[in-house]
Amino acid sequence: MATPAGLKEYSVADLKKATKNFRADTLIGEGGFGMVYKGWVDEETLAPSSKWGIGMPVAIKKLKPEGFQGFDEWQKGSLENHLFRRYNNPLSWDIRLQIAIGAARALAFLHNLEKKVIHRDLKTSNILLDENYNVKLSDFGLAMRGPFDEEAHVTTRVMGTYGYVAPEYLIYIYIKSDVFGFGVVLLELLTGLRSFDANRSHGQQNLVDWLKPKLSVKKKLRTIMDVRLEDQYSARAAFQVAKLALKCLEPNPENQPSMKEVVEVLKEIEAMEEETINSKV
């Protein structure tokens, strides 16, 4: 099977070597589609480390066939597929807003449970869509259940996906770690670009590092919007989404909005767009 440029292909033997044959003491979580194990690879070659515990830690998922039961009802697949597989019918602006609101509501629900839940691996591939573009979050293999207070919790577990996690969240657990990930997803919805792409030019590979400075300037925002969205959005609404993404991407969790607040802002933006459309009729 052909491997896309920039991606490394691993055999089952490689994965077994990296995880000590999926030994129980390397298990770090379980999601709907399988078990998540901690493994180690060489930092330069990315080959399985010759000695476990040396090199770069990675999260490796071992899929289980039954994990796909019930997947058929989410006929549209993942948000990742629609944004980056270049389908003939790219997601429209209003659908992107709908998806953002759905994902934000799901996270707000988790964060406001009596025993709060942090997803810890929010990304476009974990946002599933049904035929009406309703959202379901998947893959809770790295999720943690509270109660959590406002203080950070230290963890030795691998968490999150590169490009969706702020550096400080690699060691500490905050309820707001999901908020940062959501900010990255908003940026991907705006631009149609992946959070990380090794094929992009140096300095542009990490989407947040590259484009975050442009989010607060209207004229610059226009230059980074997904070209497939041309004439579908108002500049005012796009700028409001960009400002919300910027707040979510704040390095200090204390300055980030809660997911409940994110939902409220997105609903206001959606109403703003509907008002704009109605005024043109």
What do these predicted ranges mean?
Residues M1-V281:
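Conserved eukaryotic protein kinase-like
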